[in-house]
């Protein structure tokens, strides 16, 4: 049943997006921001865009600070007790992104379940759930904001709120997963997991490689498949996997599946539908309404955006999102999306505020005829590949 629901929004992304926006606006119409922008009078996308300006973090920071002090019904209609602490690449100041119960259940967790469902559709004989998933999470433990609210990095918030049964399928234990000091953390993870039946690993490639090498040092094994013979899947994101793939294949010692995901504090946006796909499938029914702002519009007083159905191949965009966590027309300025050929979009982590952002965007546009982003990286960005975060997204 779950896969049929996935097919429904995958095959009808525009309808899914219209329904998401309607649900968001209806839910928040009696909040402070809903009353300010008269959400109850907004009946279509055009009205919504005309009424609500594009926001950046500094624009909504006063609202978030009030929520962190205990006020509610400000940005979203249900209580906000969790905040994901993140640092954007354009600022050394931390951001605190509100995490509602809806954004946990209907975005982050729902998307994770959909990734698992799509993988089982691809590999029906998978034994993924017969063992444990090794999760190399973030490094910020849960911290109190007040008597009711807490903050931590996204992985800490997700770990803390996950259902009890999820802990049975995950390793290492929470106290190790959320350690702050990475050298000690890697050592503890290695010691705790070498005797586990690990069937999947998820984490950023850099720290995963460090962990793999340490495990081989401890065990004296030739490769990771000798330590975890049932390992079949690696889930990754955060940076381009291209420069790391060969190292992973060598260290693991056998063929496994690789899945790329794109999630952040603001939401779970996309993932490969199955290993080997050229693009990431945009999640259009997960509490996020997407708009796309041409790079040339950045910095204007009234920047123009377009909808999903208006995205043009070969052009560059920055995503503007409205979410069930209370973000309204929020600009993800740390990420630039670039439309490519054959209904895919590649996304690389640049900075709209950076001095070379427009030049880089134009260069990416000039290379848009390349069919694979991996080829583009190898040919044009080989010396900088680790600094880029490149994705291709499939719309339909």
Residue ranges and their predicted role:
Residues 1-40, 47-52, 63-70, 158-396:
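Active-site glycine/GP-rich loop and adjacent strand/helix microenvironment
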Residues 15-83, 95-99, 106, 114-125, ...:
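Active-site diphosphate/adenylate-binding microenvironment
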Residues 83-90:
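Conserved helicase ATPase motor motifs in RecA-like P-loop NTPase domains
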Residues 90-93, 334:
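Active-site-proximal glycine-rich helix-loop-beta segment
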Residues 92-97, 355-358:
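Short small-residue beta-strand/loop micro-motif enriched in glycine and branched aliphatics
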Residues 94-97, 117-132, 199, 256-259:
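Short secondary-structure capping/junction motifs at helix and strand boundaries
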Residues 117-164:
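Conserved AMP-binding loop of ANL adenylate-forming enzymes
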């Amino acid at each position: 049943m779950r896969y049929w629901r996935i097919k429904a929004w995958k095959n009808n992304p525009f309808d899914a997006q219209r329904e998401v926006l309607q649900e968001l606006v209806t839910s928040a119409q009696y909040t402070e921001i809903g009353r300010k922008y008269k959400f109850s009078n907004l009946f279509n996308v055009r009205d919504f865009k005309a009424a609500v300006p594009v926001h950046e973090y500094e624009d909504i920071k006063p609202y978030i600070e009030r929520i962190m002090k205990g006020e509610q019904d400000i940005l979203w209609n249900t209580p906000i007790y969790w905040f994901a602490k993140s640092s954007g690449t354009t600022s050394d100041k931390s951001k605190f992104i509100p995490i509602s119960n809806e954004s946990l259940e209907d975005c982050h967790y729902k998307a994770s379940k959909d990734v698992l469902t799509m993988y089982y559709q691809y590999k029906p004989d998978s034994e993924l759930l017969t063992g444990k998933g090794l999760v190399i999470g973030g490094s910020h433990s849960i911290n109190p904001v007040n008597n009711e609210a807490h903050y931590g990095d996204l992985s800490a918030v997700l770990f803390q709120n996950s259902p009890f049964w999820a802990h049975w399928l995950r390793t290492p234990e929470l106290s190790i997963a959320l350690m702050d000091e990475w050298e000690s953390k890697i050592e503890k993870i290695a010691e705790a997991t070498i005797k586990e039946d690990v069937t999947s690993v998820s984490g950023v490639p850099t720290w995963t490689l460090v962990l793999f090498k340490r495990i081989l040092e401890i065990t004296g094994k030739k490769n990771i498949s000798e330590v975890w013979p049932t390992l079949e899947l690696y889930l990754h994101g955060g940076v381009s996997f291209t420069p790391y793939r060969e190292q992973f294949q060598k260290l693991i010692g056998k063929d496994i599946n690789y899945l790329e995901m794109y999630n952040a504090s603001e939401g779970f946006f996309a993932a490969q539908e199955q290993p080997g796909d050229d693009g990431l499938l945009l999640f259009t029914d997960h509490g996020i309404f997407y708009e796309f702002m041409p790079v040339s519009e950045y910095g204007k007083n009234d920047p123009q955006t377009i909808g999903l159905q208006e995205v043009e191949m070969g052009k560059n965009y920055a995503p503007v999102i409205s979410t069930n966590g209370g973000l309204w027309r929020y600009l993800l300025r740390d990420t630039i999306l670039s439309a490519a050929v054959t209904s895919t979009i590649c996304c690389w982590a640049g900075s709209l505020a950076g001095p070379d952002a427009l030049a880089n965007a134009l260069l990416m546009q000039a290379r848009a005829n390349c069919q694979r982003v991996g080829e583009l990286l190898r040919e044009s960005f080989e010396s900088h590949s680790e600094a880029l975060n490149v994705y291709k997204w499939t719309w339909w």
